[in-house]
Structures are given as structure tokens and as C-alpha cells.
Amino acid sequence: IPDRVKLDEKEATFFIQDIYEGEGLKGIPRGTVKALRLHAYEYAYLKTTSDHNWHGIQSGWDIKRILGTVPVEEDGSVMFKAPANTPISIQPLDKDGVAVQWMRSWVTGQPGEIVSCVGCHESQNQVVIPKRVIASQKKPASLTLPEGGVRSFTFDLEVQPILDRACIACHNGEGKAFDLRGGKKDGQGYGTSYLNIHPYVH
């Protein structure tokens, strides 16, 4: 069997024939998904307790970093290049950049490998759909890097500056408005603003 990897390359190619196929986006109207946001995973920080509550309330177990986005074609197909030997999860995004689903598992491509699937968590017994799709007639898309570059993200770095700029004039710990100031942390490292805003954001 010929080797499908090219060890001198640093990227793999990923191809999805129709993102609306399968259980992953069941019930999502065609045309909703405009792009995919790709995340990679990081190792847990040194001496981190083996408990997802140390990463965030109701969050995943993993520390993530944003790699970027790639466009989805009108017919639901997508093909893109992404770093090889890197666990990647995928978020389908709507026209406003809002995630309509989250891939809870991950996929990894070897250098130079082409990784393909029919859709989003389609049945393992489903065969390729016999049709030509838009993405297969183009070169693979390159990642559009996120604002600020490839990086991990945290509440303190991404959300707290917005609260400081737009909210704490009223939500300053005085009166009836709940406190959205940053800085103070509890025993698990959660700030006052994080704990107060969490019940309203899921």
C-alpha cells in the first residue's frame, strides 16, 4: 500500500463533502453554516487538578486555542489545510460568527495526508454521496487567522476588558446591580464577574 503521508510537509488536508449530512447538524437548515472555526488542544497546566471545574464552570476538560476559520461552500462542502499532528475540533458558524454546534471529539491529520468525511458525525456505514461538490473543484482553503493571532483564550483576556469598558460603571459592586468587576478570585480561581455572569450565559 503506498504511503499517504509526506513527512516533509507541515499541514494536512481536510475534506467534508456535505456538512449537513449526519447527526451533527440534524435540524439545522441548509445555508445556515457559513464557516468553520477550528480549535486545537493544549496540555493542562502544570499541577492542575484533574477536574474540569479548574478550567471553567460547565466547561470541557481541555484547554483550547483558536487556529482560525475556513469558509463553507453553498452546497455544504469544505476543504482546507490545517496543521498536521494537531488534534483539531470544529465549530460550524452562522453568518454572525455564532457557533451552531460543537464537535466534542477531535480529528488529527498526518503530514501531507488527506482526511475526508461525508458529513458531520454521519453513520460509519454511510458511503460517499455520488455527486461533485464545489469545494472539491478548488484548492484547499487556508486558515484565516483570528484577530490577535493563534492563541488560547480566557474569560479574563477576552470578556473582562469588555465588561470593564461597557458595564462596570453601573455593575460596580454598589447598589442592586450585580458586580462585574474583575480581579478578586475565589478558591478555585473564579472571579466575581465570572461567577455573577455565568448563570446568564450558556
Spans of features found by a protein language model:
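Short beta-turn/strand-loop junction motif enriched in small, turn-promoting residues
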Residues: E21, D75-S77
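Extended low-complexity, serine/threonine- and proline-enriched intrinsically disordered segments
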Residues: P29-Q58
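Short amphipathic, basic-aromatic surface patches that mediate peripheral association
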Residues: F15-G27, I168
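Short coil-to-beta strand junction motifs in C2/discoidin
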Residues: G27-A35, N85, G173-G175
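Catalytic cores of secreted or luminal carbohydrate-active enzymes
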Residues: I1-A12
